[in-house]
Amino acid sequence: MKVKVFSLNGEPIEEITLPKVFQTPFRPDLIKRAVIASWTHRIQPQGRDPLAGKRRVTENIGKGRGMARVERIKTSPRFAAFVPFARGGRRAHPPKVEKVIWEGINKKEKKLALMSAIAATANYDLVRARGHVIDNIPQVPLVVENELEKVYRTAQTREIFKKLGIWEDIERAKRNTKVRAGKGKMRGRRYKKAKGPLIVVAKNEGIIQGARNHPGVDVVVVDNLGVELLAPGAHPGRLTIWTKGAIERLREFYG
């Protein structure tokens, strides 16, 4: 499959052949498993103090007193202690740090999921179905010359994005930024933000600084590429801008 390489002005300058990884079959099941595995590895284990509610000297008063035979405070037999239903007692089934909360995925399946997610970025129908605005984009996938990696000013990247036809998708991401419902607003998750274009580069020479402030835009070096960036929310087909150097780096990885 051949694609055109575009300059920063949005004009085609050459034609290259995409690596074989872009021909990988579409596997949404593996992509979802890989994304969930990535999510669960960010969860922090939580548990309770094993001695919580047990730091009391108690005794069993026995039968024959017309009272429930529960553990009671030794110096005040009127008050129950230690048992789950008593004030200040232990929890019946507290969360434990030993609980296995990570979802696993096999190495070969994880690799195939990444390859399938990369190939999904070249599928026009999947990119459109994901909600991206791609009416003015010359081609999918969009490959740009390596000079993009050296742009470090936000104003410059804005003009480049307008010439490449992806600015409308960034505006869509900005419009879809909403205040979260519920108590998540108090817990560092105030806004729900839409995902816009992903920029994949061979090396960072300033582009991360230049593009990171645009709503919904992510920039990543191809060596650090992951399934969650290519398929946010386990929905493959993210609008992706590749530099020519990143494409050549993929060719080294996958042939």
Swiss-Prot record:
The keyword RNA-binding applies. The keyword Cell division does not apply. GO terms for cellular component: ribonucleoprotein complex; ribosome. Keywords: Ribonucleoprotein, Ribosomal protein, RNA-binding, rRNA-binding. GO terms for biological process: translation. GO terms for molecular function: rRNA binding; structural constituent of ribosome. Belongs to the universal ribosomal protein uL4 family. Part of the 50S ribosomal subunit. This is Large ribosomal subunit protein uL4. The gene is rpl4.
